[in-house]
Amino acid sequence: MDSEVAALVIDNGSGMCKAGFAGDDAPRAVFPSIVGRPRHQGIMVGMGQKDSYVGDEAQSKRGILTLRYPIEHGIVTNWDDMEKIWHHTFYNELRVAPEEHPVLLTEAPMNPKNNREKMTQILFETFNVPAFYVSIQAVLSLYSSGRTTGIVLDSGDGVTHVVPIYAGFSLPHAILRIDLAGRDITDYLMKILAERGYSFSTTAEREIVRDIKEKLCYVALDFEQEMQTASQSSAVEKSYELPDGQVITIGNERFRAPEALFHPSVLSLEAAGIDQTTYNSIMKCDVDVRKELYGNIVMSGGTTMFPGIAERMQKEITALAPSSMKVKIIAPPERKYSVWIGGSILASLTTFQQMWISKQEYDESGPSIVHLKCF
């Protein structure tokens, strides 16, 4: 493999697709993992209307489109739309010819086997890539924090995973998944804003609520205490201007929405919170590795970006752990992109170059080669 050609790194998330070149310190392109199709027949002839739109363009025309996310809960469910997203990534965002660059893709932990094969097949057969590799998202986050052992809490838009990793290998028996992530927090925020009299219902309005969430929400260190403070003073209240100029006020909703991460029962989900799930995952690991895991709890993904989340996590895990245990939460400022950054680091290592699946190997063995070479 020629060392002159930069590998491409694509992190396909349920909410956002992050793409760029190996060796860069941040992704060049970050756009919503959305494919939109017109809701109505176009009447303006020669308007150059397309039958589908991807990413930001779909987002900006969201008023006239039906938006679909091909990745649900971290796993690809619609391959035709997924192909459109990859096509858009190569040709419109990165402006590269995929047949000239090795491609590293990321996948969710516990991704079904046939999904990995399908991914491999599309990249080699549709896009003709010269070499390919697929890597587990949480493992890449750990790499980007400079560790090979630790437990990663990766929470994005569609799914949250807790993945313990020892010496670079994930421990599959202890991986836990919670189907509760950013999109659910946004939906919950829509619901509690409705109780205040602000109604948001369409897919387009949901994006406004997502923006409110990202700009104003935070995690309370002590929920009950914070609720009390909020009821007695207006210190918590903030205002937000909607696209039409109307200004709304948001109070205890700011911390009530992200609280769902610690108490999924408010969403009528029978799951344990992210704190309890992290603890449960550690307890499923061998007793000899637990100490190292408690001391290396790494947060990654956009849903871990709420102010106050690391402090709250520290408090909750310390309460669950044995009393003498040193608990350390690592929440790097760039954690929104740490999966991508880890991929960028991995794909540019000289030692990694023999790990790629080459087109020749694919032609000889078919899609199942991915299970032999990527783990």
Curated annotation (Swiss-Prot):
Keywords: ATP-binding, Cytoplasm, Cytoskeleton, Hydrolase, Nucleotide-binding. Its EC number is 3.6.4.-. SUPFAM superfamilies: Actin-like ATPase domain. GO terms for cellular component: cytoplasm; cytoskeleton. It catalyses: ATP + H2O = ADP + phosphate + H(+). It is found in: Cytoplasm, Cytoskeleton. GO terms for molecular function: ATP binding; hydrolase activity. Pfam families: Actin (PF00022). It comes from the Eukaryota. Its main location: cytoplasm. Actins are highly conserved proteins that are involved in various types of cell motility and are ubiquitously expressed in all eukaryotic cells. Belongs to the actin family. This is Actin. It comes from Kluyveromyces lactis (strain ATCC 8585 / CBS 2359 / DSM 70799 / NBRC 1267 / NRRL Y-1140 / WM37). The lineage of its organism: Eukaryota, Fungi, Dikarya, Ascomycota, Saccharomycotina.
